[in-house]
Amino acid sequence: MSKKKANAPTSNTIALNKKAKHEYHIEERFEAGLALLGWEVKSLRAGKAQLVDAYVLLKDGEAWLLGSHITPLNTASTHVIADPTRTRKLLLHAKEIAKIVGQVNQAGYTCIPLALYWKKNKVKCEIALVKGKKLFDKRATEKERDWNRQKQRIMREANT
């Protein structure tokens, strides 16, 4: 019998792109694998990743993750030069890449990463086809969110 680790993390999420839901309308989501180096996996286990200004570049039938930042650990290997903003390859099926390329070539669509997470012992990246929000759209979603919060508050007070 194997024992479970006492300090096992409860969440599989490594990093979230919180700005994405505010800046874009999310149309469709995809799960992509990530080609990483050893020091990057160690850093991700420590939770040292950011997706703030990251985006997906589609080139020659391949998908690449640009702008993501994985901070190297101090204990990382000395014989490998660690580049925190290295371009990383996304692993997708050819049909998925073709679908994304077709949508991105339409006006207004782009592809961005939403989250990095663990699935079994592999790092996965959730990417999405998105359309940019206008300023009035952002205001409308903010008003809707506030109204939903206020409704919840009123319902809670009415039930007590």
Swiss-Prot record:
Example of a GO biological process term: trans-translation
Keywords: Cytoplasm, RNA-binding
InterPro entries listed in its UniProt record: SmpB (IPR023620), SsrA-bd_prot (IPR000037), SsrA-bd_prot_CS (IPR020081)
PROSITE patterns: SSRP
Family according to the record: Belongs to the SmpB family.
HAMAP family assigned: SmpB
UniProt function note: Required for rescue of stalled ribosomes mediated by trans-translation. Binds to transfer-messenger RNA (tmRNA), required for stable association of tmRNA with ribosomes. tmRNA and SmpB together mimic tRNA shape, replacing the anticodon stem-loop with SmpB. tmRNA is encoded by the ssrA gene; the 2 termini fold to resemble tRNA(Ala) and it encodes a 'tag peptide', a short internal open reading frame. During trans-translation Ala-aminoacylated tmRNA acts like a tRNA, entering the A-site of stalled ribosomes, displacing the stalled mRNA.
Protein name (database record): SsrA-binding protein
Organism: Marinobacter nauticus (strain ATCC 700491 / DSM 11845 / VT8) (Marinobacter aquaeolei)
